[in-house]
Amino acid sequence: MEDLYNTGVRVIIDNYLIEESKKVRDYGNYWSASSAGYCMRKNIFDRLKVEPTNPDDARKQRVFTAGHLFHEWLQSLTKDAGCSVSQEGELQDEKLMVIGHYDDIIKVDDHLILYDYKTANSRSFGYKKEMSYFHRMQLGTYLYMLRQSKEYKNLTESRILTLEKDTLRTKEFVLFYDEELEAEILEYWNTINSFWTDKKLPPCTCEEQEGGFMSKPAYNPYFYNGQPCSRDWYELWKENNKEKVNGK
């Protein structure tokens, strides 16, 4: 009998997705706002374009692409419902050297709310009881940059809306802007910029955040010799890419 799994449209789609995943996002001399809060060593490796030790496979790319489709669906709903006032606006901060795009700003009862849309499988959806540290830092960064403009200087409320992909249940967490959040955001970006300027590697903090899942081989793109964000891997990559590194 013909091997259905290895023939037909799946193979074509997976090959396409793998090729698309090889296209590295280039933020130039900026950090991605969506990486706020993540291990600074990982973010520096990303910006240097260090080759990952575990490139994404086709299944991961399918999940990633499906997430984008749900994301666009939610944006179309808020737009058609008439509550969205701005979507996919580009934000850029020349002092923090951060660039990014927010998902949605909607108007509810005469006040504005910044929304960021996420998707989750049924298992992770069930155990989420509060906003993750990474999402908090990401939203806080967006709020900080938006509030630099005259139009959104009074924007204080932001939310994460998570869509469960199996049954389309939703869950929301709220984050309000205050001086404490602002100080945390500025400290993070100023610190990573100092490491970058001084050409020093910060310690890997993947094990300290969100239960340490980013330190696992399946989630850490620079896991090598039993270590997440491996310095050994970085040194090996530098040795094999001398011309590229010296050209930085």
Indicate residue ranges for each PLM-predicted region:
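Mg2+/Mn2+-dependent nuclease catalytic core
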Residues: C83, G89-W196
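Generic signature of intrinsically disordered, low-complexity segments enriched in small/polar residues
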Residues: G8, E19, Y30-S34, R41, ...
